């Protein structure tokens, strides 16, 4: 079974052709869609469309626990997560790729843990993302000449609404990009000792910029971003070693009370 899982949108189908569909019912319900298994450049991967096959789940209703558990149950050890984000800083331009290294949780009512009792866990999130996967994707993006930021802080809001201008100006003080789907995905993966890397693609500037958003321009950038991510996945995934040496699974030794 695949050791690598991808959670993202329909753009993944540009590099991935499903060969098998696995329906899984987890202790947390059904995932966003049946897990699709196929190959990217000869490497077996499992894919879940985060928002559902037909984009039926808004960000605050995505079954995050079921998605992560389904991949875990299949034997996946590493998760590559792909997100579209808005920019909070001038230097993070539309069309850029950000390999996120930190996040701030501004969500409100999601299911954040697998351990609601009687077993209790406090997982370390000081460094939330797999250093080995981050290195591979940063180096590969540079090799391909893609516009990549090696670091970035992602603030995750509840959604589904976008920010007010006042909120956006506040968020600019402590984050670089803004989105709605990183949390609780990243901490759930950590609770199961899974590696997790986030590839965020910038679609536009958030409303702090006070520039009118051109829908056609956003759609154009999103299409270009899909193509960049497809190139990145094709080139980076074959570089991921069989054996993990990152220490992501070590959190399991210290997180239980």
Swiss-Prot record:
Pathway: Amino-acid biosynthesis; L-methionine biosynthesis via salvage pathway; S-methyl-5-thio-alpha-D-ribose 1-phosphate from S-methyl-5'-thioadenosine (phosphorylase route): step 1/1. It is an enzyme of class 2 (transferase). It comes from Pyrococcus abyssi (strain GE5 / Orsay). This is S-methyl-5'-thioadenosine phosphorylase. InterPro entries: MTAP (IPR010044), Nucleoside_phosphorylase_d (IPR000845), Nucleoside_phosphorylase_sf (IPR035994), Purine_phosphorylase-2_CS (IPR018099). Substrate binds at residues 180, 204-206. Homohexamer. Dimer of a homotrimer. The record marks 163, 215 as: Important for substrate specificity. It catalyses: S-methyl-5'-thioadenosine + phosphate = 5-(methylsulfanyl)-alpha-D-ribose 1-phosphate + adenine. The gene is mntP. CDD domains: MTAP_SsMTAPII_like_MTIP. It comes from the Archaea. Catalyzes the reversible phosphorylation of S-methyl-5'-thioadenosine (MTA) to adenine and 5-methylthioribose-1-phosphate. Involved in the breakdown of MTA, a major by-product of polyamine biosynthesis. Responsible for the first step in the methionine salvage pathway after MTA has been generated from S-adenosylmethionine. Has broad substrate specificity with 6-aminopurine nucleosides as preferred substrates.
